[in-house]
């Protein structure tokens, strides 16, 4: 592990994040151009999706976000970095890339409409997750999500049935120890990486399509695990809630789902993270959140962070691009949002 390069990458991302909030948008833009490789590809939430180059990112994502949410500030809950080992075969020679990640909330006043969602002038918290791939002192790729379903709910627009889990819950780690800006403990980091690889590629792929127990999730999660799911699913505050409120409905809908090679998988001390664009492939063969089975093959884009205590996870922060997922069912949640806004205003 090249710790000096890792620490320099952390500083690069932290400096860029800070510059993004500058009140002078030209300075925020200049900082982004400096931080990004000229040919960067950024992978964002549907309907923003894939963009090429720093200018496209600024003009199609960041500047519209700042325009809509006055005084936008980033409150980071987790800051975790490392060298990736995200292939199922464990061939680090074909991966080994350096990543810097973070998650938390953007806070601001919703003063101008955003993506067709009407502004209401009140404070909002927008969940964010980002994974930055760093090479030669520049960010060369960026995978990021904001939780649009949760934002819609804060504006009083429901595009999915009420969450089975607790809505609106996305806190920092209970121990307030998630901002890992210092040098990592190499031994502890390797233990966490090995643990996550076993969990992802052995545990999650073990379902026999009949019983939840076949996955052995109780071997991986503490009984009182805190699982902070995205808008539409909600938070589960125990393993029993996780099984009943998320895992069972998910496996009914996607019984054949399989984790693929991930975009990245890495650890730092007790924490670990993994982005997966098409990280899970499945057939939508059962009902899910009000939608009947479409029998379509779907790819799932998501971001995850975990905290390990010994041999079990005690906290898990989860993003799923629900708009992208439902679009593959043949359901346009953005259009549904606009229809419900129009109906409310009629």
Where are the predicted features?
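C-terminal and inter-domain tail/linker signature
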Residues: 1-346
């Amino acid at each position: 592990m090249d710790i000096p390069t890792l620490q320099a990458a952390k500083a690069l991302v932290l400096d860029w994040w800070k510059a993004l909030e500058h009140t002078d948008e030209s300075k925020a833009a200049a900082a982004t151009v400096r931080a990004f490789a000229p040919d960067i590809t950024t992978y964002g939430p549907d309907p923003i999706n894939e963009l090429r180059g720093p200018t496209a990112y600024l003009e199609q994502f960041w500047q519209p976000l700042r325009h809509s949410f006055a005084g936008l500030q980033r409150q980071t809950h987790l800051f975790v970095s490392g060298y990736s080992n995200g292939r199922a075969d464990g061939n680090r020679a074909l991966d080994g890339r350096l990543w810097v990640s973070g998650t938390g909330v953007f806070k601001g006043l919703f003063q101008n409409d955003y993506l067709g969602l009407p502004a209401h002038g009140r404070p909002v918290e927008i969940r964010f997750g980002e994974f930055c791939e760093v090479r030669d002192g520049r960010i060369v790729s960026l995978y990021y999500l904001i939780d649009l379903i949760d934002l819609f709910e804060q504006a009083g627009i429901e595009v999915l049935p009420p969450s089975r889990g607790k809505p609106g819950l996305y806190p920092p780690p209970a121990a307030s120890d998630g901002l890992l800006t210092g040098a990592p403990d190499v031994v502890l980091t390797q233990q966490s990486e090995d643990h996550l690889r076993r969990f992802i590629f052995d545990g999650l792929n073990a379902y026999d399509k009949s019983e939840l127990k076949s996955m052995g999730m109780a071997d991986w999660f503490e009984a009182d695990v805190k699982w902070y799911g995205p808008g539409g699913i909600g938070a589960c505050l125990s393993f029993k809630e996780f099984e009943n409120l998320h895992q069972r409905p998910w496996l009914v809908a996607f019984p054949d789902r399989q984790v693929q090679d991930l975009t990245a998988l890495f650890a730092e001390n007790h924490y670990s993270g993994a982005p997966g664009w098409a990280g899970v492939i499945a057939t939508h063969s059962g009902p899910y959140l009000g939608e009947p089975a479409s029998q379509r093959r779907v790819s799932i884009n998501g971001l995850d962070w975990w905290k390990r205590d010994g041999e079990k996870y005690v906290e898990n922060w989860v993003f799923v691009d629900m708009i992208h997922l439902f679009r593959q069912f043949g359901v346009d949640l953005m259009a549904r949002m606009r229809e419900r806004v129009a109906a409310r205003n009629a």
